[in-house]
Amino acid sequence: MNWKTYALAHAKLDDPNETCGLVVIIKGKEKYFSCKNIADQPKDIFIIDPSDWAAAEDCGEITAIVHSHPTTSPQLSMADKVACEKTKLKWYVVQPNLEQWVEYEPCGYRAPLIGRKWVWGVNDCWSLCRDYYQEELGITLRDWDRPTSSDAFLLNPFFDSSFHATGFRELEP
């Protein structure tokens, strides 16, 4: 069996939640490495457990990310495309009920400044600011790692301190 068979079985098992995994080269062969989805809303998004990512890296070379869209088409969302660019890895999306696959490779995609769907950590307020400065002013701003959920961010809102570290200064009126 090829790795897609295992990934599809994983997606069917966890339906209606999104599943996630990695394609890893182990002893010259592509293998599917299932990962835990640690997202707070696993029916809508996925976040690969960092310990699973580390374990996969220990086994071999990670060449792709796999996740499922159990209730929508396997076409990548705007947030999926942005995240794919950030990882610089090939992505595969499977729709488990239809057994349909879509493959996507990084190609320089950037979400539009107007009309992007808000997704925490991918297309959120900071990414909009960062992308605006890059596209309109040619200024590259740091991309900050976010907590895994917006609720966790509310407990520790670090963007106020991040603005200063990014180079912004408060001006006197």
Walk through the language-model features, giving the residues of each.
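Active-site nucleophilic cysteine motif
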Residues: 118-136
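Conserved beta-strand-loop surface patch within small alpha/beta domains used
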Residues: 1-62, 71-106
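Short acidic alpha-helical/loop segments enriched in Asp/Glu that coordinate divalent cations
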Residues: 138-149
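A short glycine-/small-residue-rich loop at the edge of a beta-strand within enzyme catalytic domains
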Residues: 43, 116-120, 124, 153
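...with weaker cross-activation on analogous glycine-rich loops/strands in unrelated enzymes
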Residues: 147-173
